[in-house]
């Protein structure tokens, strides 16, 4: 029998869909994954900060052809910093640089993003390289961008 029950927001975005709040009474803690530290998420995360770990995904491509519905990197960086300033523990935030696009520009964007957070004192990171799922391939083609792994 498990000692603790941990929830995780694997589907959707915890910053946009706050249905996780009402489910917190069924778990001991939760891992929230978001690309958008929205005002409602900000308030809920602060209220429940003792039971949460936040995975803040920031790729450096927010509000671009690749991630049109995601806040700009500057907006998301500022929102994450405000969350910490308001009292959410920095050590409970994992900066997710996900996905990294394996091109010279993509690696440079990922590097600059990580350095920005390192300079502010963040120590927990998670990275992954892009998988070219059909929806990702479609988004690249629609934006007129070359596929990082070629056409095959």
Question: Would you name each region that the model predicts?
Answer:
Residues 7, 12-15, 60-62, 87, ...:
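Residue-identity detector for glycine
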């Amino acid at each position: 029998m498990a000692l603790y029950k941990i929830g995780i927001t694997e589907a959707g975005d915890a910053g946009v869909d706050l249905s996780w709040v009402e489910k917190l009474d069924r778990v001991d803690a939760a891992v929230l994954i978001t690309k958008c530290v929205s005002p409602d998420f900000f308030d809920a995360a602060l209220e429940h900060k003792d039971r949460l770990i936040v995975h803040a995904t920031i790729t450096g491509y927010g509000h671009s052809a690749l991630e049109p519905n995601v806040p700009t990197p500057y907006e998301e960086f500022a929102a994450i910093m405000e969350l910490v300033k308001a009292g959410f523990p920095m050590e409970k935030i994992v900066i997710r640089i996900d996905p990294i696009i394996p091109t010279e520009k993509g690696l440079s964007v990922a590097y600059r993003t990580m350095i920005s957070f390192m300079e502010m004192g963040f120590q927990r990171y998670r990275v992954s390289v892009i998988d070219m799922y059909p929806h990702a391939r479609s988004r690249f083609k629609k934006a007129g961008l070359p596929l990082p792994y070629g056409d095959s």
